[in-house]
Regions:
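C-terminal alpha-helix plus adjacent terminal tail
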Residues: 1-21, 30, 67-69, 78, ...
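A short, well-ordered alpha-helical element
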Residues: 14, 36-58, 82-84
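STAS-typified acidic loop motif
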Residues: 18-42
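Structural motif
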Residues: 23-27, 61-63, 123-125, 146
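Terminal peptide-recognition signature
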Residues: 26, 43-44, 62, 75, ...
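Short, glycine-/small-residue-enriched flexible loop/hinge segments at domain edges that mediate gating
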Residues: 29, 56-67
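An acidic, glycine-rich surface segment that forms the CoA-thioester-binding/catalytic face
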Residues: 43-45, 49, 76-127, 168, ...
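Crotonase-fold acyl-CoA enzyme core
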Residues: 113-226
Length: 280
């Protein structure tokens, strides 16, 4: 059983979560370069659950505090629990939060986060360095991405002999294979300009305007019916793993279910069998 986060603990959080109207904002806040500790992964997981459960929140933003880094990856200087033998290693793998208590001793909450089923959009606003686990979170947990001109994206795990930790499962979907393999095998970062050229990000925005632009994009999404946004996202992501025939069939079924189950919007009822698109 996981320990819940108490509202009074928010002030000491190094992963901040705040609501701004229909937008939820996640901020990595661990100066000076926002490295991730085991506790931060747990905080992020619980904040994500709060974000997903809140029907008043239509869209999210993920960013980092300060102007040096979005996130420098896992804090390798943080002491963490190591398995004593193979039996304990297997137990830790199958039951990662056993006997954990209030403070986690390893980075296993990261796995829970990247496996979250999420159909509520999040905008990634990358200021500066985006490395390692921070880069993995950006790929797994954001849908639209903007970055400052000095942003650098990297998967330096190979430099520490840490192959296959999660970045390679998504990077090939966002970048051409030679570019993805270059990053994974050399550990060299990708500049903001190259990230834009290869469509890893949508826009390059001046650093002082980054969060403002992220809010603008989130607001553009938040005005749409949440059921439509959810279905667009679910069909898009699930179809990536389906054949063309299955993807088209799935899309058709989701479309029909939306028409049958759409809640009232703009005065039009379910019985009218109409979408609540406003006319301009």
């Amino acid at each position: 059983m996981t320990a819940s986060i108490k509202p009074g603990d928010r002030v000491s959080m190094t992963v901040k979560y705040e609501r701004d109207g229909a937008i939820g904002i996640f901020t990595f806040d661990n100066p000076p370069v926002n490295p991730l500790t085991p506790s931060m992964h747990k905080q992020f997981f619980h904040a994500m659950q709060e974000f997903l459960a809140d029907d008043q929140i239509r869209c999210g933003i993920l960013t980092g505090a300060g102007d040096r880094a979005f996130c420098a990856g896992d804090d390798i200087k943080t002491p963490y629990k190591k398995s004593l033998n193979r039996q304990e290693e297997l137990a830790d793998h199958l039951w990662p939060h056993r006997n954990e208590g209030e403070t986690p001793e390893n980075f296993t909450w990261a796995r829970d986060l990247v496996m979250v089923e999420r159909y509520k959009p999040i905008i990634g606003a990358v200021n500066g360095w985006c490395l390692g686990q921070g880069f993995i979170y950006l790929m797994h947990l954001t849908d639209i991405r903007i970055a400052s001109p000095d942003a650098q994206f990297g998967a330096p795990e190979i430099n520490y002999g840490m192959a296959g930790v999660g970045g390679n499962t998504r990077l090939g979907r966002f970048l051409p294979p030679p570019v993805a393999m270059w990053m994974l095998l050399t550990g060299e970062p990708l500049s903001a300009e190259d990230a834009l050229k290869h469509s890893l990000i949508n826009e390059i925005v001046d650093k002082e305007d980054l969060l403002t632009r992220a809010r603008q994009i989130a607001a553009m999404i938040a005005v749409h019916p949440p059921e439509a946004v959810r279905i667009e996202m679910e069909v898009f992501y699930r179809s990536l793993d389906l054949s063309k025939t299955d993807a088209l069939a799935f899309t058709k079924h989701m479309y029909r279910m939306q028409r049958l189950g759409l809640a009232t919007h703009g005065g039009e009822s379910i019985g009218d069998m109409k979408f609540a698109y406003s006319t301009k």
